[in-house]
Swiss-Prot record:
This is ATP synthase subunit delta. Coiled coil: none annotated. It is found in: Cellular thylakoid membrane. Keywords: ATP synthesis, CF(1), Hydrogen ion transport, Ion transport, Membrane, Thylakoid, Transport. It comes from Prochlorococcus marinus (strain SARG / CCMP1375 / SS120). Its main location: membrane. The lineage of its organism: Bacteria, Bacillati, Cyanobacteriota, Cyanophyceae, Synechococcales. The keyword Transport applies. GO terms for molecular function: proton-transporting ATP synthase activity, rotational mechanism. PANTHER family: ATP SYNTHASE DELTA CHAIN.
């Protein structure tokens, strides 16, 4: 995360995580954060409307209340309203990403981003999880699954600074480089 963005998001993320801990809502808040991040990423209309300076703060808060009042904890809804009041709701995704980073840091959870050519079924996810746990040297691991059809087949795993590239596109590229050296 960029330093300026980190300066904006960290106080909100730290404070909200502290509130969640005080109310014994951490697991619930983490799950809700992941769901909201997914919605934020999938619905550009929603995220753009919330970030728009044209839409009044009170209107944004009313929309947030209507959409989320039954879906998230009251403290989470208060965070959303606070971000709207402070004209920071456009940074919601960054605040939630930072909250998840802090959560993982506190619990020593490593994040592994797995990018595959197609969606992985549960058996494939479990197999990749075992492999990544042995490579990362920890059982405390969270998988972030992404799909990129450009990989053609296989997968790429990023854990911290380690990369496991078992994609077909990478193998084709390496084969092409090897053939270029031979000729």
């Amino acid at each position: 995360m960029m330093p300026l963005l980190n300066t904006i998001t960290t106080p909100y993320a730290e404070a909200f995580l502290q509130v969640a801990e005080n109310r014994n809502e951490v697991d619930e808040v983490v799950a809700q954060s992941k769901s909201l991040l997914e919605l934020w990423g999938q619905s550009s209309e929603f995220s753009e409307a919330m970030a728009s300076p044209v839409l009044e703060v009170e209107t944004k808060k009313a929309v947030l209340e209507k959409i989320f009042s039954k879906e998230i904890t009251p403290s989470f809804l208060n965070l959303l309203k606070l971000l709207a009041d402070r004209k920071r709701i456009g940074y919601l995704d960054a605040v939630l990403e930072r909250l998840l980073e802090l959560y993982r840091e506190q619990r020593n959870i490593a994040l592994a981003t797995v990018t595959s050519a197609t969606s992985l079924n549960e058996d494939q996810q479990a197999e990749i999880l075992k492999t990544v746990q042995s490579v990362a040297g920890t059982d405390n691991l969270e998988l972030n699954l992404k799909v990129d059809p450009n990989l053609i087949g296989g997968f790429v795993v990023n854990v911290g600074s380690k990369v496991i590239d078992a994609s077909l596109s990478s193998q084709v590229r390496r084969l092409g480089l090897a053939l270029a050296k031979v000729s």
